[in-house]
From Swiss-Prot:
InterPro entries: Anthranilate_Pribosyl_Tfrase (IPR005940), Glycosyl_Trfase_fam3 (IPR000312), Glycosyl_Trfase_fam3_N_dom (IPR017459), Glycosyl_Trfase_fam3_N_dom_sf (IPR036320), Nuc_phospho_transferase (IPR035902). Anthranilate 2 binds at residue 180. One of its GO terms (biological process) is L-tryptophan biosynthetic process. The lineage of its organism: Bacteria, Pseudomonadati, Thermodesulfobacteriota, Desulfuromonadia, Geobacterales. Anthranilate 1 binds at residues 94, 125. This is Anthranilate phosphoribosyltransferase. Mg(2+) 1 binds at residues 106, 240. Pathway: Amino-acid biosynthesis; L-tryptophan biosynthesis; L-tryptophan from chorismate: step 2/5. Coiled coil: none annotated. Mg(2+) 2 binds at residues 239-240. The keyword Glycosyltransferase applies. Pfam families: Glycos_trans_3N, Glycos_transf_3. Catalyzes the transfer of the phosphoribosyl group of 5-phosphorylribose-1-pyrophosphate (PRPP) to anthranilate to yield N-(5'-phosphoribosyl)-anthranilate (PRA).
Length: 350
């Protein structure tokens, strides 16, 4: 099948979802050669991946992942307006690849959102385009990445947050590692990670490195059964909601996909420069993350609050971003967000 698919894609013909499933099953089962894999993903990138193609690839990757078993729905009995359909596990994983060298915003957000009563299955990896990926900064903060599947499940179920280290859970990806490294370009594999959470997170805030991926990946999430989520891209290039410019947002709901531009001023947040959000290596970013969780004021805190606000909306914890902003600030200022980090460090090192 992969030979036929290569020939078709080279002629700039789109594959159906079913065809893509067949090809990716060959790739992830070790039936395709390295040369075939490289040719296919290069041709696909040159043509441009469609919603159907990305959906098919993600379905195969989800099928072959090592699954993390956690409770399906999380209810907060202190609330008056419990929404069973939306209160599910949240992921804040982005594609990476923005090349803006900011600190680890979505990783910091994960602790804040989990402190608000949302169970977070933070999916991530080591650095792709920056000096520090989510795995790198968590390791520097003291989180042990070399843990069992059972420990990850305990983290999510008992403390409300766990880190899902992609290389340890996506074993079928090993067949594509060599070809990807050798061709050295971004391919469909750069966007599959956030679409294939091993815990089956039903709600997401997904940052992407290209604006044209925003609406496309929102429709993919919809196809894959996402209950509610946001796909975002900062006009400054960030794969996060940003404070330096407007952010393109595609919201996924049961009703469909709606896209718009968001301005920081809508939530009363001040704009800043990119230098205000810069990070460094793992050690430097660990210091930044800890300072934000300890309550240090400034643009770094504000961008965390902004992204956390939308995460809380996605998880059904609040009805709008303004309420999410207030809840996120309280989670930091009360010390609960920092406590989540300390609990994760402790449990992963037991």
């Amino acid at each position: 099948m992969i030979k036929k698919a290569i020939a078709k894609v080279v002629e700039r013909e789109d594959l159906t979802e079913s065809e893509m499933i067949q090809v990716m099953d060959q790739v992830m089962s070790g039936e395709a050669t390295p040369a075939q894999i490289a040719a296919f993903i290069t041709a696909l990138r040159m043509k441009g991946e469609t919603v159907a193609e990305i959906t098919g690839a993600a379905r195969v990757m989800r099928d072959k992942v090592t699954r993390i078993r956690v409770g399906k729905n999380i209810l907060d009995m202190d609330r008056d307006d419990i929404n069973v359909d939306l209160e599910t596990i949240l992921d804040t994983c982005g594609t990476g690849g923005s090349c803006t060298n900011t600190f680890n915003v979505s990783t910091t957000v994960a602790f804040v959102v989990s402190a608000c009563g949302v169970k977070v299955a933070k999916h991530g990896n080591r650095s792709v385009s920056s000096a520090c990926g989510s795995a790198d900064v968590l390791e520097s903060l003291g989180v042990n990445l070399d843990v069992t599947q059972e420990t990850i499940e305990r983290c999510i179920n008992e403390i409300g947050i766990g880190f899902l280290f992609a290389p340890a859970l996506h074993g079928a990806m090993k067949y594509a590692i060599g070809p990807r490294k050798e061709i050295g370009i971004r391919t469909i594999f750069n966007i599959l990670g956030p679409l294939t959470n091993p815990a089956g997170a039903g709600c997401q805030v997904l940052g992407v490195y290209r604006e044209d991926l925003v609406e496309k990946l929102a429709h993919v999430l919809k196809n894959l059964g996402c209950k509610r989520g946001f796909v975002v891209h900062g006009q400054d290039g960030m794969d996060e909601m940003t404070l330096t410019a407007e952010t393109r947002i595609a919201e996924v709901t049961p009703a469909g996909v709606a896209t718009r531009l968001f301005r920081p001023e809508e939530l009363g947040l001040s704009r800043c420069g990119m230098d205000d959000l810069r990070g460094g290596d793992a050690a430097a970013n660990a210091v930044i993350v800890r300072r934000v969780l300890e309550g240090e004021k400034g643009p770094k805190r504000d961008i965390v609050l902004l992204n956390a606000a939308f995460g809380l909306v996605a998880a059904g914890r609040v009805v709008d971003p303004a309420a999410g902003l207030t809840m996120a600030a309280e989670a930091i200022d009360s010390g609960k967000a920092l406590a989540q980090l300390e609990k994760l460090v402790k449990l992963t090192n037991e």
